[in-house]
């Protein structure tokens, strides 16, 4: 296939280019508490819905059916994604982002360790089940995600206050519902900056609540024995990181190809608003970079 179709899609979206934004100035004009003081009657519709329907299971789903009644990415929460270096945390999160896009929940990815084109190509292959990147693959993905997927194009370290402003703008002006930060170490450099790490995560929780979005925070695990999944307390830096987030998900890959264990284990070891904590076994297709549920006895979970 030639580049014609890709060019056609790009031309259609030409008018949707974002304006230049001074994020810091924008943030300063938006952080007012005036609209937080409300009358009790303002909650009538919400109360009426609750009384009629009760507590509903809400939130975006993982792309694995066995978790749909067990875990959700609820708005107003922060999920910590951890795992050993090279165990496919970012790849898994991109795969999940495709699921969010399928239900028209807008996503913004701030990957400070990977250029946007690499992220787009990887997600395009996952979405199209393709073992290679082609014009057709990218065009199909662009048509699917063009209006709902954003990237914050910055590699390297970034000041925390600047990131807060970007998150605020993405949610308020673009309607983003999932903001992905990859990773914490590019915002708070230094494993021993415990107070800064705590303050950063607390502020992310505050923003998630205020903006009614879900924030996904990727973080690295301390070096250790990689033949078993880690837990949230193995995350580098302050224990306040895992203490303050709402959910903790851990991605572990079977690097040694042990036959009795699955290719990948996705482990939930914290869910503040849900009862389930546990693991699910997944197979991994390296050619398409897709993860699939395993229903055999070789679960390892």
Segments and roles (model prediction):
Residues 194-203, 231-235:
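Charged helix-capping and loop-helix junction motifs
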């Amino acid at each position: 296939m030639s580049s014609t179709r890709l060019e056609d899609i790009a031309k259609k979206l030409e008018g949707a280019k974002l304006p230049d934004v001074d994020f810091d100035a924008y943030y300063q004009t938006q952080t007012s508490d005036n609209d937080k003081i409300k009358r009790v009657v303002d909650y009538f519709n919400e109360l009426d819905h609750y009384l009629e329907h009760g507590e509903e299971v809400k939130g975006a789903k993982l792309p694995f059916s066995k978790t749909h009644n067990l875990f959700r990415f609820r708005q107003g929460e922060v999920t910590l994604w951890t795992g050993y270096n090279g165990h496919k945390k970012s790849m898994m999160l991109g795969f999940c982002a495709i699921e969010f896009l399928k239900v028209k929940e807008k996503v913004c990815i701030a990957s400070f360790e990977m250029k946007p084109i690499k992220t787009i190509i990887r997600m395009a292959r996952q979405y199209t089940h393709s073992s290679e990147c082609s014009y057709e693959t990218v065009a199909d993905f662009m048509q699917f995600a063009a209006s709902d997927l954003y990237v914050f194009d910055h590699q390297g370290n970034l000041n925390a206050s600047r990131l807060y402003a970007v998150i605020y703008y993405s949610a308020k002006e673009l309607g983003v519902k999932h903001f992905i930060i990859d990773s914490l170490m590019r915002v708070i450099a230094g494993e021993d900056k415990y107070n800064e790490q705590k303050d950063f995560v607390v502020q992310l929780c505050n923003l998630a609540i205020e903006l009614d979005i879900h924030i996904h925070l990727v973080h690295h695990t301390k070096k250790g024995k990689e033949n078993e999944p880690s837990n949230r307390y193995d995350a580098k830096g302050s224990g306040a990181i895992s203490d303050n987030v709402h959910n903790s998900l851990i991605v572990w890959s079977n690097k040694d190809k042990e036959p009795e264990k699955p290719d990948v284990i996705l482990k939930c070891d914290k869910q503040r608003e849900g009862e389930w904590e546990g693991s699910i076994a997944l197979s991994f297709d390296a050619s398409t970079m897709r993860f699939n549920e395993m229903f055999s006895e070789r679960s390892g979970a």
